[in-house]
């Protein structure tokens, strides 16, 4: 009987050990699944941060370029004003020609970097134009541009300066 008792006890211990091992295995599997999930989420978050940083880098570069181009528009305005001054003698004509060449070169370089003049003819568009004042005009339909007061510019399809215009009532 003692041998049967021992066999029964061994079987009980084996079953108990087997249950303990199964419980331990389930715990380890759950812990593994949790760690795997945490890893996958952290990896996805890292990839999202990487993509966001790349977009912010591109955006910062574009903004810096837009800011620089916007600053150059004052130079364009000054050169255009100088070209529009009447030249009376040969020296003034030569200076005016040099200023015109400088203006043309600057405009080519701006265009190379996607800076374009906003069309300021036809119907007023509040997305592109800034109405400085409204005027009566027999020659223009209502809500159409009468006069360009200051050129507007776009860069990469974004307005860097609205065209300042007068608009027919």
Swiss-Prot record:
Pfam families, sorted: GrpE (PF01025)
GO cellular component: cytosol
Alphabetized InterPro entries for the sequence: GrpE, GrpE_coiled_coil, GrpE_head
Entry keywords, A to Z: Chaperone, Cytoplasm, Stress response
Keyword Nucleotide-binding tagged: no
Gene3D superfamilies with a match to the protein in the record: 3.90.20.20, Head domain of nucleotide exchange factor GrpE (2.30.22.10)
Location of region: Disordered: 1-25
Stretch forming the signal peptide: none
The protein, known as: Protein GrpE
GO molecular function, one term: unfolded protein binding
Stated role: Participates actively in the response to hyperosmotic and heat shock by preventing the aggregation of stress-denatured proteins, in association with DnaK and GrpE. It is the nucleotide exchange factor for DnaK and may function as a thermosensor. Unfolded proteins bind initially to DnaJ; upon interaction with the DnaJ-bound protein, DnaK hydrolyzes its bound ATP, resulting in the formation of a stable complex. GrpE releases ADP from DnaK; ATP binding to DnaK triggers the release of the substrate protein, thus completing the reaction cycle.
Organism the protein comes from: Campylobacter lari (strain RM2100 / D67 / ATCC BAA-1060)
Compositionally biased residues, Polar residues: 7-23
């Amino acid at each position: 009987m003692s041998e049967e008792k021992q066999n029964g006890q061994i079987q009980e211990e084996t079953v108990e050990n087997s249950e303990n091992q199964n419980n331990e295995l389930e715990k380890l599997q759950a812990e593994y699944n949790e760690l795997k999930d945490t890893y996958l989420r952290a990896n996805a978050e890292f990839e999202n941060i990487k993509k966001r940083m790349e977009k912010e880098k591109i955006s910062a570069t574009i903004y810096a370029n837009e800011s620089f181009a916007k600053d150059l528009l004052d130079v364009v305005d000054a050169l255009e004003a100088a070209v529009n001054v009447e030249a009376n003698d040969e020296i003034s004509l030569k200076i005016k020609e040099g200023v015109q060449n400088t203006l043309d070169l600057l405009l080519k370089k701006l265009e190379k970097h996607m800076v374009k003049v906003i069309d300021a003819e036809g119907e007023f568009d509040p997305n592109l134009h800034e109405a400085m004042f409204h005027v009566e005009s027999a020659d223009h339909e209502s809500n159409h541009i009468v006069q360009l007061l200051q050129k507007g510019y776009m860069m990469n399809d974004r307005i860097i300066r609205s065209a300042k215009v007068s608009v027919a009532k």
